[in-house]
């Protein structure tokens, strides 16, 4: 799912010629009171810009948050993953599975260390070192801590990852907690809802 298309490639696909793009950048440079020689420099920087990497981890969840985003209309899922972000890992909709999926996750975290957005849906079970929910033999709590190290920010999608949700309800047999109870040193944005939809 890793995207390699740059903004320059997308503009070319839309029929914007390199000449027109350079002219636009030179005009923009002059409007910003920069010398005309900055036009090509701006063009190179813009054309090489990649979409932000997104790693989406599902923990104790029902997949309702993922289902809700696959049915979104503004933007559509296609626009989101092909034009706005590079959805490098999301096991529900990705083709890879097993060891291949684990390799994709490891590569995405390594290649984008410090720059990727980490999206989490589902609460994190803590009882018995998180053994009640594992992916690829790794507990959710260990996976979250590892992925959070290289994340620029964490986005909690749904009430479960934001506040613990249904898994945290009494008697809470897995000792489910929200992401913020585990990760304290990263910016976290909570988007609660079950699922988070606009109406």
Which sequence ranges carry the predicted segments?
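N-terminal export signals
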Residues: 20-43
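Catalytic cores of enzyme domains
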Residues: 150-199
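Short Gly/aromatic-enriched secondary-structure transition segments
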Residues: 69-75
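Catalytic-core regions built around general acid/base machinery
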Residues: 138-151
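N-terminal secretory signal peptides
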Residues: 1-16
């Amino acid at each position: 799912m890793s995207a390699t298309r740059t903004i320059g490639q997308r503009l070319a696909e839309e029929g914007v010629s390199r000449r027109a793009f350079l002219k636009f950048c030179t005009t923009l440079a002059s409007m910003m009171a920069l010398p005309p020689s900055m036009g090509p420099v701006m063009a190179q920087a813009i054309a090489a810009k990649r979409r932000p990497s997104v790693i989406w981890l599902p923990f104790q969840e029902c997949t309702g948050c993922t289902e809700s985003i696959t049915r979104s209309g503004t933007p559509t899922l296609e626009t989101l993953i092909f034009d706005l972000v590079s959805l490098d890992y999301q096991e529900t909709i990705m083709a890879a599975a097993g060891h291949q999926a684990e390799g994709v996750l490891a590569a995405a975290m390594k290649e984008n260390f410090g720059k990727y957005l980490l999206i989490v849906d589902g609460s994190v079970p803590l009882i018995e070192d998180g053994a009640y929910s594992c992916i690829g033999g790794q507990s959710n709590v260990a996976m979250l801590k590892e992925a959070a190290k290289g994340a620029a920010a964490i986005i909690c999608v749904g009430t479960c990852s934001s506040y613990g949700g249904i898994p945290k309800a009494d008697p809470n047999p897995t000792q489910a907690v929200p992401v913020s109870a585990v990760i304290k040193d990263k910016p976290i944005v909570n988007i609660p809802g079950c699922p988070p939809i606009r109406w």
